Amino acid sequence: MGKIIGIDLGTTNSCVAVLEGGESVVIPNKEGARTTPSVVGFSKTGERLVGQVAKRQAITNPDRTVISIKRHMGTDYKVKIDDKNYTPQEISAMILQKLKADAEAYLGEPVTQAVITVPAYFTDSQRQATKDAGAIAGLEVMRIINEPTAAALAYGIDKGEDQTILVYDLGGGTFDVSILELGDGLFEVKATSGNNRLGGDDFDEKIINWMIAEFKKETGVDLRGDKMAMQRLKEAAEKAKIELSGVMSTNINLPFITATADGPQHLDMTLTRAKFDELTADLVEMTMGPTRQALQDAKLEPKDIDKVILVGGSSRIPAVQEAIRKYLGKEPFKGINPDEVVAMGAAIQAGVLGGEVKGIVLADVTPLSLGIETLGGICTVLIPRNTTIPTSKSETFTTAADNQTSVEVHVLQGERKLASQNKTLGRFHLSGIAPAPRGIPQIEVKFDIDANGIVHVSAKDKATGNEQKITITASTGLSKEEIERMIKDAELHAEEDRKRQEEVEIRNQADSMVYQAEKTLKDLGDKAEAADKAKIESAKEELKKALEGTDMEEIKKKTEALTTVVYELSTKLYQQASAPGAGPEGASGGFGGENKKDDNVVDADYTVIDDDKKKT
């Protein structure tokens, strides 16, 4: 069996790791970086770009660049590029394909299986969407695990003592906090809470809004309508946020940000850490609510926490760390890289599934309560939040009207009392119920949550034995046929990318040969015969003409022809230079010919001195 990789599919950056010799190792991408921007771009020529290359071209191509797609997982959001609509699953699959290809290049073998992490507070539809993205990318998703749990695995894999840890995970677009108990190989999640709409992007947005307001005050120009300027502001805001984690102030300088009747306008501002803290104070406070909730759900006090683990790039923000320090009374642990720890934990879970890691038991929880709608639009909970998974729970319900022969089961996820205020996971009908007065039929509704946190629901009429089952795929989910179509589409694009890369290599080789031929002709000067030089010149021009077209076979053929004539001439000249009697221009000429002594040469007298006699 091949290696199972661990993937942290992030909002801003993604990371892939693998278990090697019992150790979790981060796999660098083809560009040499340990994390890959979760950015997908589409060039004007239709080429698909993923990662750093996509991020680099975002300023000049904002309309065809997709960022932070993770925020739309599990929704019916679509990205329109040219005439095609892309789902969040398809865009995420492009990022996963890049990570898969990087892992294959590193390992030197095909990769078909992965453990992918999701925010602990992801709903069922968001988890299902992540699994679908893996399938589209050509990966069998062996397990979906929560990001804080993965971080705890990476932190606690070699810790022998029992301890209670709090994982504070502030990523690019999501926030989670989980409390776990570690000991004797058991990683048990006691409680989890979070906010799927809060992350580093929101901190960037605060800086962007401040820059726009300040610039408008100075110049009267509102930059919001300029997409290219907005992309530059976004990059500058992210850079400023990162810099303010290490310095007390940073300069934001964006020349030629726009132009007015007075000429080009430049943005030049200084943002202090104090001002940044003021701008983002409400966001920091928003992370503390779920932190307090998780402690309350786990029935713990701040003093009961032994270690605080920080995860996600935005957890480096000094105000964030100060808020945690103040509330929990503990210095956050900084012995792990917050950008890589989740992928490393996923790789450990992959090792558990692959049999490489023994003695580890992971007991995760469901982040939100699950239930069904009952009479009066009430949400009746079957599985409360923070229930350890996998789990199964059943409850018996009855009909609301006389002679009712079918019921609709409306499956819900959330903490609100009214069904309308929670998230709908799905609906299905159980029909064939024997007519009877209301309250008589007995309908057993059963919920199963698997280890991936994905929900399966069944309803059974106890009198007739009629049963209906569904695996929840939310109304925004993809059908099996859609996933298969997207898999084929992704494979086709992968083949197109491979062909495009091959074409680039063929053209590069041809360009290199043209350059080599021109250099050879220049270096040889008058040493080569005119006929030989004409041959090279002719072959070179034919290749240059072929390069103007798109026939790759023709380019290869002409490259080979030019290579042959250049090689033949080089060989011919080398043989001439090496031959006995060759002139002074030969590489080693003169040794075999008549060695006539020049009359003007005077032989020098010399005396051999015995070194031994000189020693005293």
From Swiss-Prot:
CDD domains tied to this protein: ASKHA_NBD_HSP70_DnaK-like
Keyword Zinc listed: no
Disulfide bonds, paired cysteine numbers: none
Domain of life: Bacteria
Molecular function terms, GO-annotated: ATP binding; ATP-dependent protein folding chaperone; unfolded protein binding
Membrane-spanning residues: none
Family: Belongs to the heat shock protein 70 family.
Protein name per UniProt: Chaperone protein DnaK
Gene: dnaK
